[in-house]
C-alpha cells in the first residue's frame, strides 16, 4: 500500500547562486558525510547538490510531515546501489518514524536538465 508520495523540482541556477554566495554551507547542512564526500568529488557539484536537495525535499513530502516532526535533511541519505539506482537510508528521528509507519519499500527517482533538478519519492507500507 502506498503511504506517501513526494515530488520536488529545483532550479539549478538558484542552488548555484546559493553556493556562490555561501560556499558549501548548504551542502554541509543537507548532506550526510558520505553524500558530502561525493559532492566534493563531482565534476559538477552544483548539479549533484541540486538533485540531492530535490530528493530530500521529496522525502519530507512523502513522510507527509515536512520538518514538523523533527525530521531534518541530515537524518537520511540518498545513495546509489550497485546498479546506480538511488536508494534511501534513514537515521535518528527519520528511522524512528519510518519504523513507526512500517515502511517496507521506498522508491526514489531523480532527474535533471540544464535548468532543473527534480525528484519523486514513494513510500510503501
Swiss-Prot record:
Chief location: cytoplasm
Sorted UniProt keywords: Cytoplasm, Fatty acid biosynthesis, Fatty acid metabolism, Lipid biosynthesis, Lipid metabolism, Magnesium, Metal-binding, Transferase
Molecular function per GO: holo-[acyl-carrier-protein] synthase activity; magnesium ion binding
EC number: 2.7.8.7
Catalytic activity: apo-[ACP] + CoA = holo-[ACP] + adenosine 3',5'-bisphosphate + H(+)
BP terms from Gene Ontology: fatty acid biosynthetic process
One Gene Ontology term, aspect cellular component: cytoplasm
InterPro entries associated with the record: 4-PPantetheinyl_Trfase_dom, 4-PPantetheinyl_Trfase_dom_sf, ACPS, Ppantetheine-prot_Trfase_dom
Magnesium listed as a keyword: yes
Intracellular or extracellular location(s): Cytoplasm
Residues that bind Mg(2+): 8, 57
Pfam families: ACPS
Domain of life from the UniProt record: Bacteria
Cofactor or coenzyme needed: Mg(2+)
Function: Transfers the 4'-phosphopantetheine moiety from coenzyme A to a Ser of acyl-carrier-protein.
Family that this chain belongs to: Belongs to the P-Pant transferase superfamily. AcpS family.
Protein name, entry field: Holo-[acyl-carrier-protein] synthase
Record organism: Blochmanniella floridana
Amino acid at each position: 500500500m502506498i503511504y506517501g508520495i513526494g515530488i520536488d523540482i529545483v532550479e539549478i541556477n538558484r542552488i548555484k547562486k546559493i553556493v556562490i554566495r555561501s560556499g558549501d554551507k548548504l551542502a554541509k547542512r543537507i548532506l550526510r558525510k558520505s553524500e558530502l564526500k561525493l559532492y566534493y568529488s563531482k565534476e559538477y557539484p552544483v548539479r549533484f547538490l541540486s538533485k540531492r536537495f530535490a530528493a530530500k525535499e521529496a522525502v519530507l513530502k512523502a513522510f507527509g510531515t515536512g520538518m514538523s516532526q523533527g525530521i531534518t535533511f541530515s537524518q537520511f541519505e540518498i545513495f546509489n546501489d550497485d546498479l546506480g539506482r538511488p536508494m534511501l537510508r534513514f537515521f535518528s528521528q527519520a528511522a524512528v518514524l519510518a519504523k513507526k509507519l512500517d515502511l517496507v519499500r521506498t522508491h526514489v527517482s531523480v532527474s535533471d536538465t540544464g535548468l532543473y533538478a527534480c525528484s519523486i519519492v514513494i513510500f510503501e507500507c
